[in-house]
A protein has these predicted regions:
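Active-site metal-binding loops of divalent metal-dependent hydrolases
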Residues: 1-3, 43, 75-76, 130-132, ...
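Accessory terminal helices/loops
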Residues: 113-115, 120-123, 140, 144-145, ...
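Short acidic/His/Gly/Ser-rich catalytic and metal-binding motifs that mark active-site loops
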Residues: 3-7, 79-81, 156-161
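Active-site glycine- and acidic-residue-rich loops that bind
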Residues: 48-52, 124-136
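Metallo-beta-lactamase
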Residues: 16-19, 24-30, 34-46, 64-127, ...
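Conserved beta-strand hairpin/beta-sheet module of binuclear metal-dependent hydrolase folds
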Residues: 1-23, 27, 137-152
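Metal-dependent catalytic neighborhoods of phosphoester/phosphodiester hydrolases
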Residues: 49-60, 205-206
Length: 226
């Protein structure tokens, strides 16, 4: 969500963990200058607000990561800049303009279905359209594991049942179809799902049950990779 807004704005939401992205990065042993690429899965404020900050004089906004390319896609960027009434309050100009005007914005090439390798980033991305137009779901290989950043396709473990979609979804029936196909592939290919909105389950694996796909195991990032 970032730190640009006033406390009244933040009072409407429950923030979990470190509120400051900079301190979180520092705890991991890095600095903002080390970041080379930022992938915006989509441009709702809770997914991109931390990518830009006030300058020291609080006279203008600037990208937080001065050495990074910020990745979106052309369709979703246009969707956010000309928003529909349902999503308008989630697409904030102060999150978009600093990235675009700084020259840091780059677009990923688009495709229709499934995960495909993106030469620009050397990882795979899937596009989904139920939550918002052309949301990007990244998949990476790390330490012999396949990790998928589930973004708002599956925000929490409570959203694993196919009918349980977010109230924010612009096309809930599309979301259900996208989620069902993804979950089946996730079980088949033993994906590790990183859940952005789940305060209690950071990374999960999945299994088939008589009620559908459900959580198999739950890990913190440190448990899995340290």
């Amino acid at each position: 969500m970032g730190t640009k807004q006033a406390e009244k704005f933040f009072s409407y939401y429950y923030r979990w963990g470190d509120y400051d992205l900079v301190s979180s990065i520092k705890k991991a042993g890095f600095s903002c200058d080390d970041v080379t690429d930022v992938i915006y899965t989509h441009l709702h404020f809770d997914h991109c607000g931390g990518g830009s900050v006030w300058d020291k004089t609080k006279s203008f906004y600037r990208p937080l990561f001065k050495n990074a390319k910020y990745w979106s896609n052309k369709s979703h960027w246009g969707w956010a800049k000309n928003p529909n009434p349902r999503e308008k309050a989630s697409f904030l100009s102060e999150n978009l303009f600093p990235i675009e005007s700084s020259g840091a914005l780059s677009f990923v090439s688009e495709h229709d279905t499934g995960f495909k390798h993106k030469q620009e980033l050397n990882l795979e991305i899937m596009f989904v359209n139920g939550h918002t137009e052309k949301q990007m779901i990244p998949k990476i290989q790390y330490q012999n594991k396949t990790i998928v950043f589930a973004a708002d396709l599956i925000p929490t473990s409570g959203h694993l049942p196919v009918p349980y979609v977010m109230g924010y979804d612009v096309k809930p029936l599309v979301s259900m179809g996208e989620k069902e196909a993804f979950l089946n592939n996730a079980v088949k290919n033993n994906y590790y799902l990183f859940l952005e909105h789940d305060a209690h389950n950071e990374i999960i694996t999945l299994k088939n049950t008589e009620k559908g796909v459900r959580v198999d195991q739950s890990f913190s990032f440190n448990q899995l990779f340290n």
